[in-house]
């Protein structure tokens, strides 16, 4: 079963010209990806307001996003915009960090081979150890984020030779999207997921917002209070707020 065949049944919502797949909840998403004899192939990309704005300015990123089979609403602002534009939409926010953990748990149960890319060497090692201890994940290979452009082809060959069915890349956007795109040219038979700083959160090196903040859609505010230097990034999002309330979605 291929990603292109199955995505035909997933509701699609367009925000600023970018198609986004909508799911009722994360469990439905995970079940969908694992519905066949093996996990689906393709690329998972989290969409938030900042990424929408960046894609409008950077053609290369927009092209990468357009080619990704699964674009899901990670940011609460995207969910609210979908509901505003499509009042009948049954869609919820799916945080990338939570989705990754759910995929790893399911991969452990189904013995799905996983390859991890990105992060600092010590954080990556801790991530591997915790995944094996917590969910018995079959990790068939890993590579920290400190490799040169000249080493990329060798990494792609390692991923192909490992037989991994899930490849998660923690390098930040758009580096991780570029790496996944290029790796898929060498090895298309896997599900690729860009996960930013998720390894740091998973291993406790970075503290995530408390659940009550997450449920209120205020995780962005918690991060801002924890890291005041993010204020300039947040100010950029005023443009998206204008899009939302003016109906230019």
From Swiss-Prot:
Pathway: Bacterial outer membrane biogenesis; enterobacterial common antigen biosynthesis. Its EC number is 2.4.1.180. It catalyses: UDP-N-acetyl-alpha-D-mannosaminouronate + N-acetyl-alpha-D-glucosaminyl-di-trans,octa-cis-undecaprenyl diphosphate = beta-D-ManNAcA-(1->4)-alpha-D-GlcNAc-di-trans,octa-cis-undecaprenyl diphosphate + UDP + H(+). GO terms for molecular function: lipopolysaccharide N-acetylmannosaminouronosyltransferase activity. It comes from the Bacteria. CDD domains: Glyco_transf_WecG_TagA (cd06533). Keywords: Glycosyltransferase, Transferase. The keyword Amino-acid biosynthesis does not apply. One of its GO terms (biological process) is enterobacterial common antigen biosynthetic process. It holds the Pfam family Glyco_tran_WecG. Belongs to the glycosyltransferase 26 family. Catalyzes the synthesis of Und-PP-GlcNAc-ManNAcA (Lipid II), the second lipid-linked intermediate involved in enterobacterial common antigen (ECA) synthesis. This is UDP-N-acetyl-D-mannosaminuronic acid transferase. It comes from Pectobacterium atrosepticum (strain SCRI 1043 / ATCC BAA-672) (Erwinia carotovora subsp. atroseptica).
């Amino acid at each position: 079963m291929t990603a292109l065949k199955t995505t035909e049944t997933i509701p699609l919502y367009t925000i600023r010209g970018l198609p986004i797949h909508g799911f009722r909840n994360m469990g439905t998403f995970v079940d969908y990806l694992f519905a066949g004899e093996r996990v689906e192939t393709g690329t998972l990309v989290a969409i938030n307001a900042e990424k929408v704005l960046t894609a409008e300015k950077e053609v290369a990123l927009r092209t990468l996003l357009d080619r990704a089979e699964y674009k899901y609403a990670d940011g609460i602002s995207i969910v609210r915009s979908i509901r505003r534009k499509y009042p009948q939409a049954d869609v919820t926010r799916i945080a990338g960090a939570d989705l990754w953990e759910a995929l790893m748990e399911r991969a452990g149960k189904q013995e799905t081979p996983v390859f991890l890319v990105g992060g600092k060497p010590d954080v990556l090692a801790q991530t591997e150890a915790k995944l094996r201890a917590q969910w018995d994940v079959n990790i068939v290979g890993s590579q920290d984020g400190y490799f040169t452009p000249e080493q990329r082809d060798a990494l792609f060959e390692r991923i192909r030779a490992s037989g991994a069915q899930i490849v998660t890349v923690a390098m930040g956007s758009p580096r991780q999207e570029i790496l996944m795109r290029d790796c898929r040219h060498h090895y298309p038979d896997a599900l690729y997921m860009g996960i930013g700083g998720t390894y740091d959160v998973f291993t406790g090196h970075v503290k995530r917002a408390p659940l009550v903040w997450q449920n209120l859609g205020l995780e962005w505010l918690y991060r801002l209070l924890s890291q005041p230097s993010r204020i300039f990034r947040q100010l950029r999002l005023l443009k998206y707020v204008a899009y939302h309330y003016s109906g230019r979605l």
